[in-house]
Amino acid sequence: MNSLLKVAVVCLVMLVACFVPRVILTDDADTEYNSDYLLPKRAGCKCADGRQETYYFMGCQGGWYRCSPHYVIGDCCKKFSGKYGTFAVRF
């Protein structure tokens, strides 16, 4: 009976561990992570020119523009950063 209880406790701990969302710590992620694009950013997105850019779940933030119409939910965003048309990639 005692071993059955130990097995049940181990199974319960494993079950809880599988369903608890992963916590992103500051040393595990860069300082630009926020809740708008935390998960999709890990997967990445590509703009029309094929370059990988930042994905925002709730639309592009200020100073950024949508560069790919292929996402049903959220936007693949690119930031304009110069008078000669160069773009900054935000990773």
Swiss-Prot record:
SUPFAM superfamilies: Defensin-like. This is N.vectensis toxin 8. Has toxic effects on zebrafish larvae. It causes contractile paralysis and twitching of the tail within 20 minutes, followed by death within 30 minutes. Does not show any toxicity when injected into arthropods (cherry shrimps or grass shrimps). Negative results: does not show activity on all voltage-gated potassium and sodium channels. Expressed in ectodermal gland cells. Residues 1-26 form the signal peptide. GO terms for molecular function: toxin activity. The lineage of its organism: Eukaryota, Metazoa, Cnidaria, Anthozoa, Hexacorallia. It comes from Nematostella vectensis (Starlet sea anemone). Keywords: Disulfide bond, Neurotoxin, Signal, Toxin. It comes from the Eukaryota. Disulfide bonds join 45-76, 47-67, 60-77.
